[in-house]
Design a protein with these regions (language model features):
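Conserved N-terminal segment of class I S-adenosyl-L-methionine
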Residues: 2-134
């Protein structure tokens, strides 16, 4: 199953434009995540448990990378843990312009009452503001 999953993910990432992937991936991965049910790993972003995370990567998909529930990658989980454990980000009033927003953070950041949150990107359908930051 994992080798087949890696080939499927590699094919989709190489041949489907990113803007389309971003619109439907949150509908597909929870179903694919059923194959990863278990208690081996926990995603700190969404709290879901899996036997392991799904593979992810364009050229050589790396195993144990993508959370099927919230779509957090390793870097997203690390950033979440840093913000939660080393900063007052979730409690302190702030304004945040999030350029190239990650789906795993969008709803969570929007729900923070102390955060004035705006997303921006040139092509992403996830962004509220279409912006080129060159």
């Amino acid at each position: 199953m994992p080798a087949t999953m890696k080939r499927l993910i590699r094919f989709v990432l190489r041949h489907v434009p990113r803007r389309y992937i971003q619109r439907v991936v949150h509908l597909c991965t929870p179903v694919l995540g059923l194959a990863y049910a278990g208690r081996g790993v926990e995603c700190p972003v969404c709290g879901a448990h899996y036997r392991r995370f799904m593979p992810y990567g364009y050229v050589n998909p790396r195993g144990n990378a993508l959370c099927p529930r919230c779509l957090a990658l390793e870097r997203h989980r690390l950033m979440w843990l840093y913000l939660k454990n080393e900063t007052a980000f979730f409690e302190t009033p702030a304004r945040l312009l999030h350029v190239a927003p990650e789906r795993c953070f969008l709803k969570r950041f929007e729900k923070l009452p102390a955060l004035d949150y705006v997303t921006a990107d040139l092509e992403s359908p996830l962004a509220k503001v279409k912006m080129d930051i060159q």
